[in-house]
A protein has these predicted regions:
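Conserved N-terminal/central alpha/beta ligand/cofactor-binding core
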Residues: 1-77, 81, 121, 144-149
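Flavin (FAD/FMN)-binding glycine-rich loop and adjacent Rossmann-like elements that form
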Residues: 2, 71-72, 91-102, 106-222
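Generic structural signal for short, solvent-exposed loop/turn connectors between secondary structure elements
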Residues: 14-16, 77-84, 156-167
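Mixed-charge, polar/low-complexity N-terminal
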Residues: 42-43, 48-50, 85-86, 181-182, ...
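Conserved beta-strand-loop-beta-strand element in the redox core of flavoprotein oxidoreductases
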Residues: 79-97
């Protein structure tokens, strides 16, 4: 999420500099020249360019002698055998087998856990199950909106491309306050374009567009 997905703004834990997070944060500070250099937008105190974060994660991984990173690897299946995990993957067109005492599912959607029959829920749990006031009274299957984040660069001059044939400005008319916004879905949350652009401003003249107000959230369901 912090690199390839473009959401290079970290929520909270600014003062809990420990473990992998502490190592990554310290590396960002060294790269940009200080903690204040990461406070470029108002959504977070830790903002950075995705490419920089990607480079730092690769350096951290490369420094570990017992860690092997294989990009472009897909999970096939796993089984438990004589107290060990036997995991099959596909890499570079070939099937590979890994044996381990511990298996951690770090896939985005829990592919390994699902394949092994681990119970799971989809959607919002009920208030009775969580004892949280913010939860719905009854459970439902609604999942969090998908977001296609965009990283823009401020060139300091007009670099607009030719208007695409199917472009419909009405879809995003109310992402911020402007004359085209006449019927907003959330009248109390129509903020200025300056607020939208400064929300995820990154170092290096970049801007993260991760805007939930009639912006780039895409609602769908399972």
């Amino acid at each position: 999420m912090l690199t390839a997905a473009g959401v290079s703004a970290v929520d909270g834990n600014y003062r809990l500099r420990a473990g992998i997070w502490g190592e990554f944060l310290d590396s960002l500070v060294m790269h940009y020249g200080g903690s204040d250099s990461l406070k470029t937008g108002w959504v977070s105190n830790v903002l950075f360019e995705p490419a920089v974060g990607n480079d730092l994660f690769h350096r951290m991984a490369a420094a570990e002698p017992l860690l092997t990173v294989k990009h472009g690897t897909a999970f096939v299946d796993a089984r438990r055998e004589k107290g060990r995990w036997i995991v099959r993957t596909e890499h570079a067109g070939k099937t590979e087998t890994v044996e381990a005492r511990v298996l951690i599912d770090a896939t985005e959607q829990g592919d390994v856990a699902r394949a092994l029959g681990v119970p799971y829920d989809i959607g919002m749990e009920s208030r009775e199950a969580t004892d949280e006031d913010i939860a719905p009274e009854t459970a439902n299957g609604i999942v969090q909106d998908l977001t296609y984040v965009a990283i823009l660069k401020d060139y300091g001059h007009d670099v607009r491309i030719a208007r695409p044939e199917d472009y419909d400005p009405a879809l995003f008319a109310c992402c911020c306050a402007n004359p085209l916004c006449t019927n907003p879905r959330e009248p109390n949350r129509v903020w200025s374009k300056e607020m939208m652009m400064s929300y995820g401003r990154l170092p290096g003249g970049k801007i993260m567009i991760n805007w939930p107000i009639e912006g780039n959230d895409y609602y769908t369901n399972m």
